Amino acid sequence: MRIRVAAVATVLLTLAAQSFAAYKISVWVPPWNANALTSIQLNGGAITESNPIWYSWNADYSIAKEWNSENPTWRSSMSGLLMPTVQNAVNGSFDGNASAAMLATAATRDAHANALTQLAVSNGYDGVDIDYERVPTASRANFTTFVNGLAAKLHAANKKLSVTVYAKAGDNENWNGPGSQDWIAIGGAADSVKIMAYDYHWSTSAAGAIAPLDWLDQVATYAEKTIPGSKIMMGLPWYGYDWPATGGASNASFASAHQTMLTNNAALQRDAASGEPYFSYSGHTVYFQDAAGYAKKIDLLKQKHGGIGGFAHWAAGVEDPDIWKVISGTPVTPPPPPPVTPPSSGSGGTPVQSDFLVSGPTTMTVMQGGSVSGDFQLVPVNGFTGTASVAVAKTFSGTAVPGISMIAAGSAVKIYVTATAAPGTYTMTVSFTSGATTHQQSVTVTITPNTARHRAAKR
């Protein structure tokens, strides 16, 4: 990975902390991802509502428990309002036909609404988030009736209702799913409406941006026409896709995308229409999310749709850790370089050769199962204008440590630690090389134990 002095690959994100204070921040928490728990434990102070995916359906429309719904560690780690997500998934797949059957009669609608209300009351939840997908368009009126009835029951019990909906830019999208969702009616009944403003390009489509900016603008514009602004939660992606030349895409997290890019020596590019990073390798095209792309989406929505209630996110555990700096208002920027005193001229006034220094953090701390990033900057000395490659040592103190991986991307070095990596203090070496000249900086890395161990369930 090569960088130029004039364009060090570090993104300055200047969203002020107070600018986010007016917005709610919710996060869907997939319990089948072992990294999700660590993510919310590390960043709970920024979260105003947690939506763990804890419940689905049985074949008779009753509520089925999913992973970790009764795990005390998971529950105690949730921040803000605790509103578990219930999905209309039967045997692992969203079931529109089962939904149509449940919605078809007043008796089954009422029984299902009672079950959801009892779920919130008996478990002490603040409410529920329903994510009912692939519901047939023909069930639109019945779905509206159901949402109205469910909201009334939850509100009578002093509980809240969140309804997750497909993104759309108008009410003319009548395919199963968005066609069943009357935003005016849902917005009138629910306490919040989470709009899944992602999957513009999806796993079986052609490769492309997951949430283009102009499309986000259109979706938000329609939302403001149909839903009270304070109830609008724009759902943003934290995930990516890896599309092969033929066939469907596989999911890509920030970490896995970076690893794929480095393994294949691919050139990172950025899509102007979405702000999303992407790259290609061996017939594949990968789009994913990072802090810079996320900031562009947030900037657009705040500037043009500042009256919305907040932002929802899919999903904890797959994100660029620096996204939390954007949310908290912490600038994502390298530390200031140390003062540099150019060497004096040689005898006879002959200029000395230009050179460079490496500036970056000297200590980094990361919890088991987490990740941490540090930005390293090339500092020119005596007029240096060349390029330099960045490398990171693959061992700690000369010894390979299982469960630890390091990635150099531009000037950013990121460390990923599995839940089983041994706690301790290690030394990492970051090297900048230009021609025959190499300068290094040693970094002390401390891995702390994660006391909230849990069984990692898989989906």
Model-derived features: positions:
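N-terminal signal peptide c-region/cleavage motif recognized by signal peptidases
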Residues: 16-17
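Glycan-binding loop/region signatures in secreted carbohydrate-active enzymes
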Residues: 85-99, 231-300, 331-337
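Long beta-sheet-rich domains in secretory-pathway and surface-associated proteins
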Residues: 348-459
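Glycan-recognition patch characteristic of GH18 chitinases/ENGases
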Residues: 22-115
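Conserved, mostly hydrophobic/aromatic
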Residues: 50, 130, 193, 234, ...
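Substrate-binding surface in catalytic domains of secreted glycosidases
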Residues: 59-69, 140-264
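Active-site groove signature of glycoside hydrolases
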Residues: 113-142, 192-206
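Short, acidic/polar
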Residues: 30-44, 106-121, 174-184, 290-303
